[in-house]
């Protein structure tokens, strides 16, 4: 089922890219494997999937212990500072939403002697439950720090669209992030990645310039909540 789902999804991504004149190779498909076991991840690996996303730092840690660097790991969930020591095992951290968190990631990355790829999470909707940087001034402050930190490689921005059926609100959330990214790039920053789009809204995200899609249920099916 997982292999079939991946093929259907890749075909759909190709179709949307053709429609909006984009190269499908410019988009990373991140399979969000939270609450799924190593066996399901291995099925996806056998189907050619190499990018995986985890929302919980300790779940990432336990899966990394089993699979290691066979795959590329993306930490995409809300990150508490006391869990950074686990999250820095990932190749990418998408959810940097404060200066103090960026500083903590820098500290751990320096200790490990690694350059940590990160994205700054921006709040582009009014939903209280959504995390992310609010306000351009705060965003510039964090981006400036990350751009100058010795062990951080700031590669882009991330957002989560509002949970709504109103497509205009979803599109605005994504286009706002793209415009912020363009503005930062015009000021000398080099941010190539836009992490936006999940199972319910990835088509709009591609149309608005997403380069990283975070997709779970369209690949693995509905989540089964169990422990590893």
PLM regions and their residue ranges:
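Conserved alpha/beta-domain cores
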Residues: 1-200, 208
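A short hydrophobic/small-residue beta-strand
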Residues: 51, 212-213, 219
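Expand to "…catalyze enediolate/carbanion chemistry for C-C bond making/breaking, isomerization
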Residues: 206-207, 219-227
């Amino acid at each position: 089922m997982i292999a079939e789902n991946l093929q259907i999804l890749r075909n759909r991504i190709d179709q949307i890219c053709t429609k909006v004149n984009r190269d499908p190779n410019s988009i990373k498909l991140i399979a969000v494997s939270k609450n799924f076991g190593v066996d399901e991840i291995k099925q996806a690996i056998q189907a050619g999937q190499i990018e995986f996303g985890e929302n919980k730092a300790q779940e990432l840690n336990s899966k990394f212990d089993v699979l290691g660097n066979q795959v590329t790991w993306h930490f995409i969930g809300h990150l508490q500072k006391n869990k950074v020591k686990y999250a820095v095992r990932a190749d990418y951290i998408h959810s940097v939403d404060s200066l103090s968190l960026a500083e903590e990631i820098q500290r751990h990355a320096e200790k490990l002697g690694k350059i940590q790829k990160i994205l700054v999470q921006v709040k582009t909707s009014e939903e209280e439950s959504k995390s992310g940087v609010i306000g351009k001034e705060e965003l510039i402050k964090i981006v400036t720090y990350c751009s100058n930190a010795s062990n951080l490689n700031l590669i882009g921005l991330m957002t989560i669209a509002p949970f709504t059926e109103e497509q205009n609100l979803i599109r605005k959330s994504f286009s706002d992030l793209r415009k912020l990214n363009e503005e930062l790039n015009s000021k000398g920053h080099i941010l190539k990645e836009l992490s936006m789009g999940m199972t319910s809204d990835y088509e709009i995200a591609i149309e608005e310039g997403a380069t990283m899609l975070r997709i779970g249920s369209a690949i693995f099916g509905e989540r089964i909540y169990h422990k590893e």
